[in-house]
Regions:
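Hydrophobic anchor at the beta1->P-loop junction of P-loop NTPases
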Residues: 9
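Walker A/P-loop
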Residues: 18
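P-loop (Walker A) phosphate-binding loop of NTP-binding proteins
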Residues: 12
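NTP-dependent small-molecule kinase module
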Residues: 25, 143-209
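ATP-dependent small-molecule kinase phosphotransfer cores
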Residues: 33-116
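A glycine- and Lys/Arg-enriched "phosphate-lid" helix/loop adjacent to the NTP-binding pocket
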Residues: 98, 103-161
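ATP-binding Walker
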Residues: 15
Length: 209
């Protein structure tokens, strides 16, 4: 059975992760691959998804500790993992917006020991390729009431942690360019290099196998 790949795009909120993740999926399709887009947490995956949505966007769970919240994020990833693995084993390229490193960065920025949040997520599936987007936030799309978008100083801490982790793990770091097209081409250059080096098959090649 053909094996796909698991790609993750990281970055602070309001920096264009959704836009560029979806553009990457479109590019992969044009290039003959079989991609699928995911955004973590998986909000429609019960029971943890709707619960996280209510906490992050609707002000529920104010009595939750950060340990409780990060455990809930981890559980959402863990519960969805069988579906994630099935996609990859079927030959799909999964393009995920946010994943474990998001939780590690936010949990650490909010006062948890980095090593503890790392250990919490240790047993989850590891991505094959990660990329960090950096640059200025688009403040006009900031979601009012979202607990992780309303605190600008906290977002700056997260940005610093993500940059440090990118350096530690050797992720490509892409700075936002004046145009979306220019940013996309930088992203595509890194992804294409990874795909060529890893030998992920295109749809026609999978069918011939």
């Amino acid at each position: 059975m053909p094996k796909g790949a698991f790609l993750t795009l990281y970055g602070i909120n309001n920096i264009g992760k959704s836009t560029h993740s979806k553009r990457l999926v479109q590019r992969l399709e044009r290039e003959g691959y079989d991609p699928v887009y995911l955004k973590y947490p998986i909000y429609d995956f019960e029971p943890t998804g709707p619960e996280l949505d209510a906490i992050l966007r609707k002000g529920h769970g104010k009595d939750l500790t950060e340990v409780d919240l990060q455990t809930l994020f981890m559980q959402n990833r863990q519960d969805f993992e069988p579906q994630l693995r099935a996609m990859i084993e079927a030959g799909k390229i999964v393009v995920a917006e946010d994943y474990t490193q998001t939780g590690i960065a936010w949990g650490t920025a909010k006062g948890l020991e980095e090593s503890w949040v790392e250990a919490l997520n240790e047993d989850l599936l590891k991505e094959d390729f990660s990329l960090l987007l950096i640059g200025e936030r688009a403040m006009h799309v900031k979601e009012e009431g979202h607990i992780h978008e309303s605190d600008d100083e906290l977002v700056k801490k997260v940005d610093k942690i993500l940059r440090a982790r990118a350096k530690r793990f050797g992720w490509p770091v892409i700075e936002l360019q004046p145009t979306k097209d220019a940013t996309h081409e930088l992203i595509w250059a890194e992804v294409e290099k990874f795909l060529q080096e890893s030998g992920v098959a295109k749809l026609a090649s999978q069918g011939a196998a």
